[in-house]
Amino acid sequence: MNWSFLLQLVITILLIVLGANWLLSSFLLDFKRDLTGVALSQQSSISSVRKENETAYYRSILVPTGFPLTTGLGLSLKYKIRNGNFGDVWNAIMEVSKGKNIIKFTGREKSYSLSELNGMAKRIFPKLSNKNFKNIGIANSIATVEGFTLSLASMMTSIRTGSIPHFLPAVPRQRLEDVDVLIIDSWKSFKMLNGSEDWYKLIVVCDDPIESLQFDANCDVITWKELIDGFTKDTEYQYTPPDDNSDDKKLFAYVTSPWNGTNSFNQICLVSNIAEFIKGFPLGNELNSNEYLTISTKLANSSASLQIWGKLFAVLLHGGSASFINPTTIDCESLQETTLLFTETKDVVKLIDSNSRSGLLNKIYLSWATNLLSEGIFTKIARIEPHSLEKLRCVYLADNVKDAEVISTFPEKIPQLKKTNRRITPSTEQLNKIRAQLGSRVVLELYCPYAIMGPVAHTNFYDYRVFGKSVDDNVVCYGTLSTTLEGKMVETETNPHLNIEKKQGMLCIRGFSIGKPVESDRLEKALHLAERFGGGEGWMPLVGVFGLFGQDGCLYIYNQ
């Protein structure tokens, strides 16, 4: 045997393999990557100066320093630019859709066209506006056709008559100032009012009118079916804005949290949230008329519904459709038409666990797919249900801040950070497995419920990076701040170990999607806290939310 020949052959094969690997990693993979490493390492715009005891200001690279944050829809009115309001949004939705696209609600087999829903809302509108009611309390899920149409009609009154929808976590146990109308789900809930029905000028019950015969009501009570009786399909919603832009400055909604703190949100919060969601889609993957948004009903429960309107209206504005689904019943078959899914992480994990395949070939596909994703290359080769999930292109995972109640109370004393390695949110490696098995992009979003409309921050559509275990055990990457917000880290006396020089601290934000405390004592505390940590200037400290801004400009929150 010629050993010299064998040695040459081995060396030649080794050189070919190394050369092919170099060529693949240096050139071919770069052409296939959705986003370059340079782009992923520079995701935020950072102000050039900072004050003592705080970091520079961070904002998404989509809204560079010196340019305005996302503040609305940028509509024209003569020589002016308007932010817009609900009236503009619904008018445009009806013009784009011609009433044909649909929404499917829970508890109903049929889907409702927008012309039906618009006709119902316009039929309800006179009843909610003819007595000059102040606020309209809504304690019914938006995932039902009754709750949705009543909310829609209430939003119409916010522009036309000034009556404001007030989203409630439950039927109030105490009298709420200025709430003249109460919307509840059933006669059972009506029975539990136990005398408090006298607080309201009108009560709307979303239940069968026949059952009303069992109750001897001394107040003005009407059912949803009676309200919409005689409605007709309507493909138009006429709205002409006033010349002084006054409608853009009106209130959009009040939202009360489960711990009884109420915040008000202006029309600019709504339109900015819509624009922010639209802006989050990269070139080539924009929203289109084929979109079908599926929303978990848990995210649509009355006061929690604050987070769904931006996504829902954005999809409808592009001629898409939507549905609400009970998270306990999510399966691959129920997602056949879905292009965008908005739910919580545990629901997606459960879906994958119930459909994952354990064969050797499937494991090879999954390993291959996750490796490609870690290189920045998207693939659908490991999708668990190729037929059912064919249309699914992006999943939005809602993650809430650790203690929204503490943030809502604006406490004087700042809590201590207590780090833990116990991570509830999926690691970056697990997120890539979810992407691989669903065959879709996954965007992780951070919410501060009841206080901020839309996400505080979210990961990039194309960000598939995998961090080391030590990083994942310590922090969660939530990407950049929403384009409606800018933020900074501030130093706190109770956490001296967080080094502001290393961009560590407590998160403060300001922008156009933040609610304003309604109660005078909460408002006073909020102003005092803003002055203490931000020098006023509109900053809102998210008390107890500790993290850092990375070299890539992304927001990293410590595991607590």
UniProtKB/Swiss-Prot annotation:
Membrane topology classification: Multi-pass membrane protein
Signal peptide range in chain numbering: none
Keywords, comma-separated and alphabetical: Membrane, Transmembrane, Transmembrane helix
Coiled coil residues, start to end: none
A GO CC term assigned to this protein in UniProt: membrane
Chief subcellular location: membrane
Name of this chain's protein: Putative uncharacterized protein YHR045W
Organism listed in the record: Saccharomyces cerevisiae (strain ATCC 204508 / S288c) (Baker's yeast)
